[in-house]
A protein has these predicted regions:
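Long, low-complexity, charged/polar intrinsically disordered regions in eukaryotic proteins
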Residues: 93-165
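Short, cationic-aromatic polyanion-contact patches
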Residues: 216-229
Length: 229
């Protein structure tokens, strides 16, 4: 079977599975050649995906046409960086200045840019307060090279959630007062996100039919909305 098993899941995945579980749900359910994180009493399949979406490809290909599915993808809206020693004792703690929102989803959605057009799929983005637990400093690989410890994500609190249930919900992410046509940079400023993320948002929105090309201003491509929220 393929899928994330209980023995392999990280603390963030486990905590979110508990958070989303409802009375009557079944957890870690064998489903054909896959394992599903949660199967709702009404038949909806819930997959909690803390990393990239590419590993979900075979599961989506096999199941999405015949089952309602919900992908839960957490975003660390607020985070603390905790440094611990080999015994797990806390050495230091600091709050990260980085703040993130639901748009971070599009860093992952570029793997399947038109995914949200499928009528059986919803993506839910819990905006979380997290602790990122890391080693005291850089670690070394077997070859002796210094490597950055990716750490371990732990859930402290779910602050809010954003649900995208189709292209119309994606269109609603574009600020209503943004003048058209607009460049990717202008949309990034309006959304308050970095230019690379704005480019990925544009890529996915074009694939979903939410944006259309509208020529260029100098060398910068222009876009217009194709639907309103």
């Amino acid at each position: 079977m393929s899928g994330i098993g209980v023995l392999r899941e990280g603390p963030l995945h486990a905590a979110l599975k508990d958070y989303y579980a409802r009375p009557g749900d079944r957890a870690e359910v064998p489903f054909g050649r896959f394992v599903i994180d949660l199967v709702r009493a009404d038949g909806e399949l819930v997959e909690i995906q803390t990393g990239g979406f590419s590993p979900l490809g075979p599961k989506l290909d096999a199941l999405l046409d015949h089952h309602r599915m919900r992908i839960v993808h957490p975003v660390a809206a607020e985070r603390r960086i905790l440094r611990v020693d080999d015994a797990g004792e806390l050495l230091s703690a600091r709050r990260s200045p980085r703040r993130a929102g639901a748009l971070e989803l599009f860093d992952r959605l570029v793997s399947f840019p038109s995914l949200l057009a499928h009528p059986n799929l919803a993506i839910e983005v819990p905006l979380c307060r997290e602790d990122h637990v890391r080693a005291p400093g850089p670690t070394r690989s077997r070859s002796g090279r210094r490597t950055r410890d990716p750490g371990e994500r732990r859930l402290s609190e779910v602050l809010d959630t954003v649900v995208l249930d189709g292209p119309a919900d994606v269109a609603a992410l574009i600020p209503a007062d943004l003048d058209e046509p607009f460049t990717t940079r202008e949309r990034g400023v309006a959304l308050g996100c970095r230019i690379l993320l704005a480019q990925r948002v544009a890529y996915c929105m074009r694939a979903l039919g939410v944006l259309a090309d509208a020529g260029k201003r100098g060398r910068a491509p222009l876009h217009v909305r194709t639907q309103r929220s």
